[in-house]
Structure formats: C-alpha cells, structure tokens
C-alpha cells in the first residue's frame, strides 16, 4: 500500500471477475436494492464515516455499495483471516473504496488491516462502526482503556491477543491519543453476529459501553434466516469443497442447537448423514430430540463420529481429549465466529500436513489423523463462499437500517444495546417476498381489530419467538 493506493487486496486485476459476480448478486438481494431506491435521493448516511469489519465477500460488496449510494464514506476489512473472496475485494477497491482484505491473512496482517479501517486520509476519526464479531469495536475500546492507563495489554491469553495488543501498542506509539479520540467520535455500532452481540451485552452489563449499539443478529429476519437457512446451505458446501467426502450414511455430531446449530443439523441430515446433537440448554436439547436428533455428550459420541462441527459461540467445545478419542480421518470444523470453539492451539505441536488451502491433516503420535477445516475458523467461508446472496440480503438490509437509525437519530439512544423495532423487521421480510413469488393475505379491518393489530402490522408482539 502506498499513499496513492489506499487499499490492500491480493490482485486488483480480479476486479472485472468480481464485478460480474457482484452484478449477479444484486439480482438476488432485493432488500438492499430496495434500500437504494428508497433512500438514495435523501442520502441519510451523508456525513457517515463507516469503519466496516465484515467478511469481504461478493454479498458484502453489494452492502458496501449500498452504503455508498446512501451517502456514506466507507473503509473496510474482513472480520476473518480466511473469509475474503479476493475478486470481491478487488472489485470494491477498483471503485475507489479503501478495502484491506486478502484470503489467508496472517494474524499480524489481520490486525493491521483492522487498524487501517480507522485511518482516514484527512486524519479525522470514523463516526460509525459496522461490525461482525466485535473485533473492530474491541480494538478501539481496548486501545482507549490502555491510553487511560489501565493495565489491559500486559497479559495476553492467546496468540491472537498477543498480536492484537502489539498492534494497539504500535498505534499508540505512532498516534498518541488516537483511540480515545476515535472512541469519542463514534455515534454507534451495528453488530452482525451472536459472538459480537454477546461482547456488547457484557460491556453494557459492566457499564463500559461508550456508545449505542444495534443488535442486528437478533432481528428475526437475521437470526431465523441467515443463521438457520444460510447455514443449512453453506455448511455442507464448505465440507464438500474441503474434503469431497460423501456425507450420506456418515455419523455427524453438531455441537449446539441454537439457530446456527439447527441449520447445521438440517444441512447434514439433508445430505444423508446420521446426525447427533450436543447441548447445554435443556430447551434446545428438547427441540433437537423432538426434531428427531439423538442428543448426546461429545465425550460419548466423539469416538463414533465421522464429522464433528461446532456452532456454539463458546470456547473449548472440542477439547484435545475429545480429538484424541476421534476415529482416524474424522473431519473437524467450526461454523461459529471464532476459532477457540476447537482447541486448535493444543494441536500445534503435532504433525500438520497442508492438503490445500484451509484443509490440514493432523497426525497424532499413534498415527491417528484428523482433517481440520479452516484451522478451526468459519469453514463455510474458509472452505466455501459463505451464505447465498438472497439470505444475506435480509441480514444486510437490517445492517443498513441500523446504520441509518443510529446515524440520524443518535440522541434517541442511550449507551445500550438495542434491537430494531418489529415494523422494520417485518419490512425487511416483506421486501423479499416478491422474489419468491409469495403473496400475503391481507387482514380485514374487523380481523385486525379482533386480534389487536392494524392490517399493515406489526402483527406480533416484541417477545414473539417465531
């Protein structure tokens, strides 16, 4: 990257290919295209300086261009070292949008690129964050605490934290006061995924959230669609591209039965696998059992599994002891946001053979081997291309509405975590019905009055679970 080249991509010559796929994706993303039509003239994001940290895919490229059509300035990095589609990054960089994303980044590159989304040419700060997993948000908040004299950088708990803390120290030395100034300038953050939302709620509980946040993940049109139907298609896609294994008849264990786990279990069952589920939550466990899945512990199931996938958002779900029990050539992967669901660090002293990008064969001293996908990071994005465009349109339309809401109505929000109101959730769903040829029934005035709603909605209470 030079002063005249404010981007880092693998190969800018891939831009034409990326543009062709981007044009196709637009036809599958009616929510984002409707947002351009509705808000393009009014420019509600004019003046917004958005730092985006979200998988740099073709679908994300459509989101970025939508934000720009609505008036925003944007700088972008991927939120995962393996999830970038290099042709998508090139297509966006070729339009003049600063993007810092390469498939297969080192951790050092990842945190350098995260830093770059806050480095505007005029030296002024960002005023909005669009996040997926919370890394961009945490980068600023941890840095600001360090500048305030708190001892937050001296005891890293992982290799990732070592690299993160080193990058924070580097920026503090280069630009004193940077993090404090940047934190004060943020009007709000919109967060895409369960893991990042959990981080925000923890900050709120401790009184450490310095700006409002919108929890996009828990919009119904995100969690019940992206998390479930998206994983239902992309999980098996990633396993197939990574291994070419036939799943029919295999024993697959899905760790977790939240929305992502439900989609993952259905994905594997649809491919013919015999699916078992592990759960800590009795409600989710009962759902799994009544959906026809055997509910087991991983301690019991590890030795018979052909495929094991984590979906929980928690850490140490698959331990080194579990992996020692697994059969030869068991496939191990994760579709939760971070790589700590699997104790990958405990495997580093074993023999690793790279089969192809994001596929590693790991050999134990007794000769038993495991196939690890994407080094324990998101296999649907590392080994494949993530969720289909249509389902991401719903998620990303929520992101656009959240950005507009926080940027234009900042004073209406306290420094807390919010969910988009029901009428906007229903609006997002409505925008996607025509593409599927679906026709809504319309309540009469009498019917609406009988159940206490209007014929236009909202049709459900805020606590309705769907």
Swiss-Prot record:
UniProt main location, coarse: cytoplasm
Residues reported to bind substrate: 57, 132, 192, 222, 226
Cofactors that this protein relies on: NAD(+)
Top EC group: hydrolase
Binding residue positions for NAD(+): 193-195, 227, 256-261, 279, 314, 335-337, 380
Subcellular location: Cytoplasm
Alphabetically ordered keywords of this record: Cytoplasm, Hydrolase, NAD, One-carbon metabolism
Cofactor binding description: Binds 1 NAD(+) per subunit.
A GO biological-process term: L-homocysteine biosynthetic process
Pathway given in the UniProt record: Amino-acid biosynthesis; L-homocysteine biosynthesis; L-homocysteine from S-adenosyl-L-homocysteine: step 1/1
Record InterPro entries: Adenosylhomocyst_ase-like_sf, Adenosylhomocysteinase-like, Ado_hCys_hydrolase_NAD-bd, NAD(P)-bd_dom_sf, S-Ado-L-homoCys_hydrolase_CS
Family: Belongs to the adenosylhomocysteinase family.
Annotated function: May play a key role in the regulation of the intracellular concentration of adenosylhomocysteine.
Full protein name: Adenosylhomocysteinase
Source organism (scientific name): Brucella abortus (strain 2308)
Gene: ahcY
């Amino acid at each position: 990257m030079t002063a005249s080249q404010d981007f880092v991509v693998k190969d800018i010559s891939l831009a034409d290919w990326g543009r062709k796929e981007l044009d196709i994706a637009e036809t599958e993303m009616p929510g984002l295209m409707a947002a351009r039509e509705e808000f393009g003239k009014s420019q509600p994001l004019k003046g917004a300086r958005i730092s985006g940290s979200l998988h740099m895919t073709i679908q994300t490229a459509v989101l970025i261009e939508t934000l720009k059509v609505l008036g925003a300035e944007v700088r972008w990095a991927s939120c995962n070292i393996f999830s970038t589609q290099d042709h998508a990054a090139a297509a966006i960089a070729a339009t003049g949008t600063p993007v810092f994303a390469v498939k297969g980044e080192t951790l050092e590159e990842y945190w350098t690129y995260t830093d770059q989304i806050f480095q505007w040419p005029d030296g002024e700060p960002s005023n909005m964050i669009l996040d997926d997993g919370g890394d961009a948000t945490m980068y600023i908040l941890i840095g600001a605490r360090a500048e305030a004299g708190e001892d937050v950088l001296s005891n890293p708990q992982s290799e990732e934290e070592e690299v993160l803390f080193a990058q924070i120290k580097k920026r503090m030395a280069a630009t004193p006061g940077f993090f404090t100034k940047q934190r004060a300038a943020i009007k709000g953050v919109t967060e895409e995924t369960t893991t990042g939302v959990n981080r925000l709620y923890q900050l709120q509980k401790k009184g450490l959230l310095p700006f409002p946040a919108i929890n996009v993940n828990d919009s119904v049109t995100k969690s019940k669609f992206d998390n479930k139907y998206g994983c239902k298609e992309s999980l098996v896609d990633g396993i197939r591209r990574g291994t070419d294994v036939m799943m029919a008849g295999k024993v697959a264990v899905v760790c977790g039965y939240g929305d992502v786990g439900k989609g993952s279990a259905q994905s594997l069952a649809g491919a013919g696998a015999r699916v078992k589920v592990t759960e800590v939550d009795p409600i989710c466990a009962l759902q799994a059992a009544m959906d026809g899945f055997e509910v087991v512990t991983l301690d019991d199931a590890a030795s018979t599994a052909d495929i094991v996938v984590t979906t929980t958002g928690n850490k140490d779900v698959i331990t080194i002891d579990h992996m020692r029990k697994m059969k030869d050539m068991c496939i191990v992967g994760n579709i939760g946001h971070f790589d700590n669901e699997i104790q990958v660090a405990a495997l580093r002293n074993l023999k690793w053979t790279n089969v192809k990008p994001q596929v590693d064969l790991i050999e134990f001293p007794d000769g038993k081997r495991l196939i690890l996908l994407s080094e324990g990071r998101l296999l649907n994005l590392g080994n494949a291309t993530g969720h289909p465009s249509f389902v991401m349109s719903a998620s990303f339309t929520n992101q656009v509405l959240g950005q507009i809401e926080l940027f234009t109505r900042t004073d209406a929000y306290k420094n807390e975590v919010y969910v988009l109101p029901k009428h906007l959730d229903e609006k997002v769903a409505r925008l996607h019905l025509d593409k599927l040829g679906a026709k809504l029934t319309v309540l009469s005035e009498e019917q609406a009055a009988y159940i206490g709603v209007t014929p236009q909605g909202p049709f459900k209470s805020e606590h309705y679970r769907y």
